[in-house]
Amino acid sequence: SINHTESKNEQQQEVFTLGFNHGCNPRNATYAYIVVPGIHSARKMNHYRKSPVEILANTDSMQIVRHTKLGIWQMVFYKEGTFRSGELSVSVDKACALMIKDGHCGNAELHIADPGQTQSCIKVELLIPEISSERKTVLCDFRNTGIYAGASKAYKLKNIL
């Protein structure tokens, strides 16, 4: 069990099943998918394909998506790394999950999670030109988080940038 605050009793609920025929010896094969709630027909899925969700990176070191209408960037870094798109730059010193909301305006928020529950400090360096012309650093301290290990922390970027 990774969550020590919930019941130890098994809980079940249908989520979804996804399968791919990878062939016998796939090498460096790639694919991408998004999970969209509430889509129950091929017609609705065809409409969603024209959606504002963009897959910007899908590698063994990071997965980055952006919802252009909602102004949300979601980023999973599997190790230390840097993502750049246009003038936006995000660097992390270790594995983490990030979400940047409203990155185009003064109400921007940064959410940081440590899904590996390492209870360490994660350093995030940001350059978001719409908010500030300077690169800024966020130190997110997950040490001593105990039963809340893995929970995300939120930062108002106007207070940092």
Named regions from a protein language model:
Residues 1-17, 83-91, 123:
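Trp/Gly-enriched beta-strand surface patches
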Residues 6-8, 21, 53:
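Short, flexible coil/linker segments at or flanking structured domains
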Residues 27-29, 106:
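Short, well-ordered loop/turn elements at secondary-structure boundaries
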Residues 36-161:
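Non-catalytic terminal regions with compositionally biased, polar/charged low complexity
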